[in-house]
Amino acid sequence: MTRIFLFSALLPHPVALLFGACGGNTAPSDGGTMDGAAATLDQHVPDRARLDHPLHPDAACGVTIDTPPLLDSPHVAIGTPVTYDSNPPSSGPHYPVWAAFQEFMTPVDRRYYVHDLEHGAVVLLYRCDDGAGCPDIVQGLRDVAASLPDDPICNKSTGPRNRVVITPDPLLPTAVAAAAWGWTYTADCLDAPSLKAFVSQHYGEGTEVVCANGQTQF
């Protein structure tokens, strides 16, 4: 049975976040660039074959890799409720603006980071249940992100060196997760080998090849 997750905004005033003058931050919608970062739009990447069933690689804890059906993925207005078919989402309707390729300390609304996936990013996610944070998990995710080489389409002198987002997500079913366009990874712990393999294999899966930075404050 397919699970459906109805996502309401994690943040109370998303419009203010998008258009507010916090530190003068403005984020481009598709077709724009920020800080001179290189971007190339509409270079469609061939979709890889979907899995017949979820994979459970050997790991230090339970790991599941899956390929949910790709959803129609139009832009929707800020605040529009969106239903995704997987947790974490890996495609679907999303906001016109995406999150910057960086680490965030507070949750990024899913409707932003799905747009990052469309741009070929991998989003690294975690859920802390004790309220004290997950320093070991967060450092492990940083190490995974650091293991990726520089992306040749990114201008690291004025923007990100690659297309990776790290963010907490309290809606996750597991302590650790990752998403690429059309691919999901969930794990009960931080298993660095399997997560690094997932990120390496599915980086750049999006239908648009974009490395312009996005919104930096949430």
Question: Language-model segments: what does each one mean?
Answer:
Residues 68-71, 134, 141-142, 196-197, ...:
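Extracellular/mature segments of secreted proteins
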Residues 1-20:
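Sec-dependent bacterial lipoprotein signal peptides
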Residues 21-23, 60-63, 129, 133-135, ...:
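Sequence contexts marking disulfide-bonded cysteines in secreted/extracellular proteins
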Residues 15-16, 53-55, 203-204:
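Residue-level signal for mature regions of secreted extracellular proteins and peptides
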Residues 18-52:
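Ser/Thr-rich, Pro/Gly/Ala-heavy low-complexity intrinsically disordered linkers and tails
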Residues 45-114, 134:
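Surface-exposed, low-hydrophobicity interaction/linker segments
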Residues 106-155:
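Mid-length scaffold segments of soluble, non-membrane domains
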Residues 147-218:
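Helix-rich interaction surfaces within compact, conserved domain-sized segments
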